[in-house]
Amino acid sequence: MKIVFWGTPEFSVPILEALINSDHDVVGVVTQPDRRRSRGNKLIHSPVKTVALENNIPVLTPQNIRQESLIQQKIINLKADLNLVVAFGQILPLLILDSPPLGSWNIHASLLPRWRGAAPIQRAILEGDILTGICIMLMEEGLDTGPILLQKEFPIDVLRNSYQISSDLSSLSATTIIEALELIRTSSHFTKNLVEIYPKLIKQDVVNCDPIYAKRLTKKEFQIDWKRLSEEIHRTIMGLYPAAYTSLNGKRIKLHNSIPLTPSFSTYISNNYDSYIIDYISTSSYPGEILAVIPKLGFIVGTASYPILILNGQMEGRNSVSADILAKQIDLSIGIRFD
């Protein structure tokens, strides 16, 4: 089948590569325009554009696809059998959605209708979900409301951050899309008519889950509140990787990976760390107080409940380092409290 691929970030790349390596024909790629890098003010391609150019696929980069009729017509003139949208970053006009005979399809990184919208992976982690996944759905005008062709579940490992889980879901999407395209092709083999595919679709309103929207992340959410529970702080650090931060003497410090020192993690801690680490589970402290700086490991911080072990972090303008090195960089010692 002839496909126009719409995507922008790193998440989309394995799916595009899977299509390129299949028997399908990617006749065009639509992605976000080049952006200027803060260092050096150099224009850089999106990850998807880089792969498309490497494979000699025509690329279109609209600023706003809904307002650019010439680019819309160029896309329609490609005469694709279907559109495939994976984290493109703009809302497509109905003219584009309806133009291919086999419709426009989207890969969404959640188990719809839970976490429709812009930040499904982060919201799932922040809320403590134990399960996420991907959906391949037929697009319509509503935000992530279309009927579902395929859904794949994926367990959330609480010790993997949002970048790692995003990579997991991207890989899952790359294999699942080939399965989905085969379903679409075999269902419409003789007519190339979308009507033939409808019996295989599941409407979201019959799924046993109320719709929940993954609203856009706010700046305030990235600041760690040490007066919250250890597990909640851990989910903030892992879910908003690599941008969750705290402050010390007015300077911002990003924290990248962590382990809550709670009874539920005691077996994991005992199996992976020196025995004395487990003793901090019962240590009382003030929220944000440094309880220990441990060579070759990290530092332990008090919260409103159990302490939390910080494993990696980053000063402003520096590279990410292990938390014990970060502690030296910012001169942490027992008793110091984050702002």
From Swiss-Prot:
Belongs to the Fmt family. The lineage of its organism: Bacteria, Bacillati, Cyanobacteriota, Cyanophyceae, Synechococcales. Its EC number is 2.1.2.9. Keywords: Protein biosynthesis, Transferase. CDD domains: FMT_core_Met-tRNA-FMT_N, Met_tRNA_FMT_C. GO terms for cellular component: cytosol. InterPro entries: Fmt, Formyl_trans_C, Formyl_transf_N, Formyl_transf_N_sf, Formyl_transferase-like_C_sf, GART_AS, Met-tRNA-FMT_C, Met-tRNA-FMT_N. It catalyses: L-methionyl-tRNA(fMet) + (6R)-10-formyltetrahydrofolate = N-formyl-L-methionyl-tRNA(fMet) + (6S)-5,6,7,8-tetrahydrofolate + H(+). This is Methionyl-tRNA formyltransferase. (6S)-5,6,7,8-tetrahydrofolate binds at S110, L111, L112, P113. Attaches a formyl group to the free amino group of methionyl-tRNA(fMet). The formyl group appears to play a dual role in the initiator identity of N-formylmethionyl-tRNA by promoting its recognition by IF2 and preventing the misappropriation of this tRNA by the elongation apparatus. It comes from Prochlorococcus marinus (strain MIT 9211). GO terms for molecular function: methionyl-tRNA formyltransferase activity. NCBIfam families: fmt.
